[in-house]
């Protein structure tokens, strides 16, 4: 996983545990794709301080994930739901009974809704 994408996801899960300034700088860096110089100018902080905050927060976010594993669990749930959808597709294609096909379609819809679409 690309470093910024991973940091962005970790920020989504654990950003609330950071200070407002840390969260703001990490958001600008990860989600808004600001350079260190742009963040420095925007926050009126030295470039070196911005760099240090990003490195420190990155380590902090990774340590939260190592301990709590929220992002890992979330990714595993998504994979499991997609796997279930694939199995339901297989069953629907190979099933001849109309009532069972309807039930499979309802289950697929519920899983799709829980995946956000």
Swiss-Prot record:
User: One Pfam family name from the record?
Assistant: UPF0122
Highest taxon, organism lineage: Bacteria
> SUPFAM superfamilies per the record?
Sigma3 and sigma4 domains of RNA polymerase sigma factors
Q: List, alphabetically, the InterPro entries matched.
A: RNA_pol_sigma_r3/r4-like, UPF0122, UPF0122_fam_protein, WH-like_DNA-bd_sf
Q: What does this protein do?
A: Might take part in the signal recognition particle (SRP) pathway. This is inferred from the conservation of its genetic proximity to ftsY/ffh. May be a regulatory protein.
The family classification in the record reads:
Belongs to the UPF0122 family.
Q: Report what the protein is called.
A: UPF0122 protein CTC_01247
């Amino acid at each position: 996983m690309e470093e910024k994408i991973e940091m962005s996801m970790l920020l989504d899960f654990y950003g609330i545990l950071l200070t407002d300034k840390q969260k703001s700088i990490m958001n600008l860096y990860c989600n808004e794709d600001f350079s260190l110089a742009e963040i420095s100018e925007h926050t009126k902080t030295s470039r070196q301080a911005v760099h240090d905050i990003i490195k420190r927060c990155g380590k902090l976010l990774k340590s939260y994930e190592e301990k709590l594993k929220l992002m890992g669990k979330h990714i595993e749930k998504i994979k499991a739901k997609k796997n279930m959808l694939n199995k339901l597709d297989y069953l629907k294609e190979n099933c001849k009974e109309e009532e069972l096909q309807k039930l499979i379609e309802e289950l697929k819809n519920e899983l799709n809704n829980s995946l956000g679409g």
